[in-house]
């Protein structure tokens, strides 16, 4: 991270106002402004592991990663700068959590791109910190208010649940496919062979639906799941537990925390990071898979048909197959052979 997002550029127009402030940065932290802005003190809280990785290198323990912020995470802060995400329920979860911890009188700034729906912050916070728009630039809005009343926050009330073919899927705000199984994952699931054995890694696991569906037909697989999102990690753990499926689940920026090799890697990789389109995660997944597959192991991913993954697959593995497709999605399969580049 070096270039600033439009939201951060709007904040920089007001940088003089923050020099004496003890700031908590939270929300969709897409750059390292929290580490670079001139303030009296800065902390950051994020639910995204890859954002925490960047910020913690510069901020140390003042950058925190977790699903729910605690009193220690906001200690001594007199100002909140919240970057609005594209997902309104995610904003609700995070803001109610943070405002329940910050003292009355805290200055509240909310910034975000207009297309993300940042305007709805006014209505969301009306009972706690009435907001006024104080700047508009770079297709972003900046809102300011002061905390007048702490909300009551109960994380348990944000859990959702749905069923897929008799399986229970637990979800939280900010988790991909929160309201039901997406078409791409359905297509990938249709290609999985029953009675598969071996070690399976589910990268970008979301709510864990791919893993539990796979395990139902292949109970002898040994599952490992990872995601950059704290809500996804917690949702996957809950989904596994709800279906009596065992597996290890942890936060990881693609393979950053993954150890060892697997017989199969499955993924429905993201191509958005917040409001921005990003193919980085999927390309890192494909290129890094060769370091985490056993000989003869396979990578199986589903992706929008228009995304340019065949070239990366061929470059990395020497070849690929399309084993299922619709008008919108393709399921790609690549096998770890001697042709594959060993990372």
Swiss-Prot record:
One of its GO terms (cellular component) is cytoplasm. Its EC number is 2.1.1.172. It catalyses: guanosine(1207) in 16S rRNA + S-adenosyl-L-methionine = N(2)-methylguanosine(1207) in 16S rRNA + S-adenosyl-L-homocysteine + H(+). One of its GO terms (molecular function) is 16S rRNA (guanine(1207)-N(2))-methyltransferase activity. PANTHER family: RIBOSOMAL RNA SMALL SUBUNIT METHYLTRANSFERASE C. Monomer. This is Ribosomal RNA small subunit methyltransferase C. It comes from Escherichia coli (strain ATCC 8739 / DSM 1576 / NBRC 3972 / NCIMB 8545 / WDCM 00012 / Crooks). The lineage of its organism: Bacteria, Pseudomonadati, Pseudomonadota, Gammaproteobacteria, Enterobacterales.
